[in-house]
Design a protein with these regions (language model features):
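Active-site rim loops that border cofactor/substrate pockets in soluble metabolic enzymes
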Residues: 33-58
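Conserved catalytic-core segment of NTP-binding enzymes
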Residues: 51-61, 66-149
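Flexible, active-site-adjacent loop/turn segments at secondary-structure boundaries
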Residues: 25, 43, 67, 71
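Conserved active-site and cofactor/substrate-binding residues in soluble primary-metabolism enzymes
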Residues: 22, 44-47, 136
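Short secondary-structure boundary/capping elements
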Residues: 16-19, 44, 61, 88
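N-terminal phosphate/diphosphate-binding loop that engages ATP/GTP or pyrophosphate donors
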Residues: 1-40
Length: 155
């Protein structure tokens, strides 16, 4: 990780600028109460997890943008976001593909067959939500997330 000081294996910081260009800035601009950024070197995410969980303590819901975190947590809802130019999934996304509840894409031609080593059986029956690059949301996606969170509260 180029942005992580060499003497650290992980670092948790809180974003405060909703007008910035990073993902955490966009979360704030979209209305998030707060946005945290956990950076961890390969293999250090498990060490970083206690600090992240402590930082999230008391929060009813949290959005965690990470496939790798799925090795440690079972989310109430898991969305796999496929960007415009992604022709191949990252290894961490492929590893937890079966645990995705739905897919979100800006590409109307989303074709899982273009993803090497991806089983179509893993994807069958899972909803795909098309969003615009300006909005990254739509009413059906919002309703899906609400329904998943409600179902998780019942369990």
């Amino acid at each position: 990780m180029d942005d992580l000081p060499t003497h650290l294996d992980f670092l948790l910081s809180e974003e405060s600028n909703p007008k910035g260009r990073g993902d955490t800035c966009r979360y704030l601009a979209a209305g998030a109460r707060r946005a945290l950024w956990m950076r961890a070197r390969g293999g250090s995410l498990g060490q970083a997890l206690p600090g992240l969980l402590e930082a999230l303590e008391g929060d009813e819901h949290a959005i965690i943008e990470s496939s790798s975190i799925m090795a440690f947590l079972q989310p109430a809802v898991s969305l796999l976001v496929i960007g415009e130019s992604e022709r191949e999934l990252k290894a961490s996304a492929r590893q937890f593909l079966a645990r995705a509840d739905a897919f979100v894409t800006v590409r109307p031609d989303l074709k899982p067959l273009t993803w090497p080593a991806t089983s179509l059986q893993t994807l069958e029956g899972k909803p795909v939500f098309l969003v615009s690059p300006d909005e990254w949301s739509n009413p059906a996606l919002c309703q899906f997330v609400r329904d998943q969170l409600t179902a998780a509260e019942v369990r």
